[in-house]
Design a protein with these regions (language model features):
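Polar-ligand-bearing catalytic/cofactor-coordination segments
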Residues: 1-43, 82-131
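Post-HEXXH active-site segment of zinc metalloproteases
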Residues: 33-63
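Alpha-helical transmembrane segments of multi-pass membrane proteins
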Residues: 73-85
Length: 153
């Protein structure tokens, strides 16, 4: 989901049992609080720019207070992580219910088939939510570590 244009772009998942849940997930992003989505978009870009500019300034030895730059990076990383994880967790948790409701209303599968798919969604979400949170945490930690190393040079 692209917040600025209010458009959903989905990979080719036609032959996947996760198709309905994936569509539901992206649709849920489109109805999340617009202010949070726009904040996430703007803040994510500021976060990336801060990281790149800090690296460049550190490499050309233009940073006087290295601890201040690193502390700001840690602070920005926390904000980035909490906003992104909130948006992703919210969409991942709710997508299962939206997908299940759609399959029941559309009557495209039997109750047993729907139950099997929903059970698969539960397994997928159990792993997926943890994985997304881990990935976001690692992404912020790695950026912070890279900046710390460059600041030491």
């Amino acid at each position: 989901y692209i917040a600025l244009t209010n458009k959903i772009i989905i990979a080719d998942v036609k032959n996947s049992y996760t198709r309905i849940q994936t569509i539901a997930h992206e649709c849920l992003h489109s109805v999340q609080d617009r202010k949070i989505l726009l904040f996430n978009f703007i803040f994510s870009n500021i976060y990336i720019i801060y990281f790149i500019v800090s690296i460049i300034l550190a490499l050309i030895n233009k940073i006087q207070d290295k601890m201040l730059f690193l502390t700001i990076m840690i602070f920005l990383s926390y904000i980035y992580y909490f906003v992104r994880s909130y948006l992703e967790n919210d969409a991942m948790i709710k997508a299962k219910y939206v997908a299940e409701e759609y399959m029941k209303e559309a009557k495209i599968l039997s109750e047993e088939e729907i139950e099997n798919i929903v059970n698969s969604y539960n397994k997928l979400n159990n792993i997926g939510i943890k994985t997304v949170n881990f990935q976001l945490m690692m992404e912020t930690a790695i950026k912070t570590i890279i900046l710390a190393i460059v600041l030491l040079i």
